[in-house]
């Protein structure tokens, strides 16, 4: 069992699971349940369970991949640079919309968790789900949450937005590209950005800035709820 403690174990499991997810997504005409992140998560959990491996054994290498999540978010700056003129022109409206959306997300999760009497650890795990994984996981751990539950919540949330985001926008007749991008990024994280890229450069840029600002707002807002949870 000592060999499974090397970093290669977690890295290889992660890459293979993600590779299978990418293959299934591509050959299923992008069926939303085969989103690579979701498939990788399900396969990874299944493999660890069937092989009777512990999370610690996996995470020896898994945390190396997690480390690169944070610098990878720098890539969001590319579409932002291309749409700098719109950011300067509508910066107040953009920031206001993202901040309100972020706070609403945290408040709704808090109210629902309280209403159904969720365990404190689970509640703390769910609160950061508004942020992207790179921010949500360390935040969850810092407030006494369970990162694994947080990861599931973030990814599941993003998959829903990836699958139904465009439909929701069409149903509610949201036609402004800036509004579309902000909605997708605020609700769907990186997968929301992916949908934005499919729609256009403006949507992609707005979704990218939403992911970044939501993370900052979540980090600031969630500690304010801690006295209410304790």
From Swiss-Prot:
Topology within the bilayer: Multi-pass membrane protein
GO-annotated cellular components: plasma membrane
Membrane-crossing segments per the record: 5-25, 31-51, 61-81, 92-112, 149-169, 177-197, 209-229
Compartments reported by the entry: Cell membrane
InterPro entries per the UniProt record, alphabetical: Antiholin-like_LrgB (IPR024891), CidB/LrgB (IPR007300)
GO biological process, one term: programmed cell death
Listed PANTHER family: PLASTIDAL GLYCOLATE_GLYCERATE TRANSLOCATOR 1, CHLOROPLASTIC, PUTATIVE SEROTONIN TRANSPORTER
Task performed by this protein: Inhibits the expression or activity of extracellular murein hydrolases by interacting, possibly with LrgA, with the holin-like protein CidA. The LrgAB and CidA proteins may affect the proton motive force of the membrane. May be involved in programmed cell death (PCD), possibly triggering PCD in response to antibiotics and environmental stresses.
Family to which the UniProt record says this protein belongs: Belongs to the CidB/LrgB family. LrgB subfamily.
Protein name in UniProt: Antiholin-like protein LrgB
